[in-house]
């Protein structure tokens, strides 16, 4: 079994990789984590690598370029910057840095050679993307890390292990030279205690099943699982002792009516029938969520729960909701 909350040992991690099945709110949770980690005059970088511009939409800013820009102020004077990493731009930066091909690289891009290279070479795109994340995570200025933490809004669970572990294969393919050293550096970071991979899920069968599969794959790939972030948790409206009977359809309408009458409410029979049906439906959901939560707990990973919010926006949450989720994360120990 596991314990709830953010483990103290994760305070060492400098790179937080956030993945999850599509539709679980992965981008929103990654943004909230970046805000939580920036609280108290700290600086974090929120990175996306899939070209969706989800961060820009969530923070209501123009599309992010291939440069780090401040997008939010965290409580206590902290700062969140964001970066949309593009494989073609990363390759141009790589060519300019290691081969002094700045102008020539731009010419190659106009000719379509850069897109061709990142499409043709298996794994090269992911090496470039993770290489840029590694550079930002390890970068220093005046003897201090530029960022206290980097949060990566990673590909979904079905692709994340391949995305994170492709650098190991590339390191074997390139035995010498800059690409070899870059791959080795990325491998060291991603397979160290400085990196934690968090999985966002919902208390539903399919997301939970995919979460458990991903945790097992991370272990096999020697990638460090962090926490399971259970998103959109709804509070139960029934006493725990009443859930099993109600979920089984055993709700005494006469008793409900008597209780309502005692409270001064005389409902139409049709309305009462609807109320009883909603009670049964709610109890069925609560019981199903209890079972999926038990499956997650038995996997042994720490669990962090985030409430369902009603604000509308990306993933069903607006910017105010992101700040609220960041506050909840801080309350559960995120530092």
Language model: regions and residue ranges:
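C-terminal lobe/tail of nucleotide-utilizing enzymes
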Residues: 1-10, 191, 195, 205-335
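Pre-Walker A (Motif I) flank of P-loop NTPase domains
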Residues: 11-16
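Conserved beta-strand segments of the P-loop GTPase G domain that flank and frequently precede/overlap
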Residues: 19, 47-48, 153, 198-202, ...
């Amino acid at each position: 079994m596991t314990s709830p909350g953010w483990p103290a040992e994760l305070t060492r991690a400098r790179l937080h990789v956030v993945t999850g099945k599509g539709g679980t709110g992965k981008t929103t949770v990654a943004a909230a984590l970046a805000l939580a980690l920036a609280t108290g005059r700290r600086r974090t970088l929120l990175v996306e690598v899939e070209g969706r511009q989800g961060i820009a939409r969530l923070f209501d800013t123009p599309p992010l370029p291939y440069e780090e820009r401040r997008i939010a102020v965290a409580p206590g004077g902290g700062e969140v910057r964001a970066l949309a990493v593009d494989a073609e731009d990363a390759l141009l930066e790589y060519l300019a840095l290691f081969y002094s091909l700045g102008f020539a690289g731009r010419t190659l891009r106009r000719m379509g050679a850069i897109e061709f290279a990142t499409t043709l070479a298996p794994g090269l795109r992911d090496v470039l993307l993770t290489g840029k994340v590694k550079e930002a995570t390890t970068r220093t200025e005046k003897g201090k890390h530029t960022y206290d933490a980097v949060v990566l809004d990673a590909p979904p669970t079905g692709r994340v292990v391949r995305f994170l572990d492709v650098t190991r294969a590339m390191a074997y393919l390139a035995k010498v030279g800059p690409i070899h050293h870059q791959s080795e550096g990325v491998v060291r970071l991603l397979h160290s205690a400085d990196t934690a991979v968090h999985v966002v899920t919902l208390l539903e069968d399919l997301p939970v099943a995919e979460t458990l599969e991903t945790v097992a794959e991370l272990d096999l790939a020697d990638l460090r699982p962090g926490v399971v972030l259970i998103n959109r948790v709804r509070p139960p409206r029934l006493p725990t002792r009443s859930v099993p009977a109600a979920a089984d359809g055993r709700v005494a309408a006469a008793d409900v009516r008597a209780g309502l009458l005692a409270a001064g409410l005389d409902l139409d029979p049709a309305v009462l029938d609807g109320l009883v049906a909603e009670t049964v439906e709610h109890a069925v959901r609560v019981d199903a969520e209890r079972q999926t939560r038990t499956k997650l707990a038995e996997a042994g990973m720490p669990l962090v729960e985030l409430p369902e919010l009603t604000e509308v926006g990306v993933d069903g949450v607006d910017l105010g909701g992101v700040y609220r989720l960041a506050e909840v994360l801080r309350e559960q120990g995120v530092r």
